[in-house]
Amino acid sequence: MASADWGYGSENGPDQWSKLYPIANGNNQSPIDIKTSEANHDSSLKPLSISYNPATAKEIVNVGHSFHVIFDDSSNQSVLKGGPLADSYRLTQFHFHWGNSNDHGSEHTVDGTRYSGELHLVHWNSAKYSSASEAISKADGLAILGVLMKVGPANPSLQKVLDALNSVKTKGKRAPFTNFDPSSLLPSSLDYWTYFGSLTHPPLHESVTWVICKDSISLSPEQLAQLRGLLSSAEGEPAVPVLSNHRPPQPLKGRTVRASF
C-alpha cells in the first residue's frame, strides 16, 4: 500500500479517505465516541490476560505518518488473550496517535472528551492465521488494545521509546529497539470497553476487536512535543513534522459497546 496517497492534511486527510477507500463510510469504522451511559456491562467478559516478553521487541520504524515499535511475532511469546477474545492474539507492533495541541490527539473519545494522545498495541489472531498480513483483513483477525493518554506528569516508561525517536527522525528510517516490556505502558487497572471496529487509517479494514482501557496513562507536555518532532519527510527533503495523526470518531451505526466493569 502506497502511504503517499493518504495522510492527515486537508487534501489527503480523513475526510478524503473514502475516495480511495470506500470502506471509510462502512458500518464498523473506528474510532468511536464511547458513551459510558450506553455501554452495557457484560458479566460474561473475562479479565484480559496479557503476557509480553521484553525479548520480542525488535526495532523502531518511521512509517511517515507515525512510528511503529515492531515485535518478533514468529511465535506466541507476546500475547493477548481473554477479555472478549475467543483466541490468542500475538503482538506485532505498537504505535501512537497525537494532535497539534495538548487538548486533543486521541482517536477514541469518552463522552465527547478528547485526550492528548492514544497508544495502540496491535495483535493478530495466531490461532487461525499464519501472519499479520493474512489476518489484517479477516473479521476476527486483529485485536487492538487502546490506551488513552492524558497530559500530566512525565511517564518514565515512555521515555525509552521517545529517546529512540532521534534515531528514526525521518521517514523510512529504522533502528534496533530491544528489551522493552510494553506492559509497562498500561494503566494499573485493566477494566475495559470493547466493540467491533476497524483500522483507524487506510486500508481501514473492518477486522478489529477493540479493547479500550477505562483508565488513561499520563505523559508530560515535553513528551508530547517529542512525538510531534517526528518527521513525515525523508532525509534530504524539507522537514515536515508529524503534528497530528488522528482520525475523528466515526458513527456507531447500531454497534454495541460492552464494558467489563
From Swiss-Prot:
Zn(2+) binds at residues 95, 97, 120. The keyword Repeat does not apply. Substrate binds at residues 200-201. One of its GO terms (molecular function) is cyanamide hydratase activity. It is found in: Cytoplasm. InterPro entries: CA_dom, CA_dom_sf, Carbonic_anhydrase_a-class, Carbonic_anhydrase_a-class_CS. SMART domains: Carb_anhydrase. PANTHER family: CARBONIC ANHYDRASE, CARBONIC ANHYDRASE 1. Belongs to the alpha-carbonic anhydrase family. This is Carbonic anhydrase 1. The lineage of its organism: Eukaryota, Metazoa, Chordata, Craniata, Vertebrata.
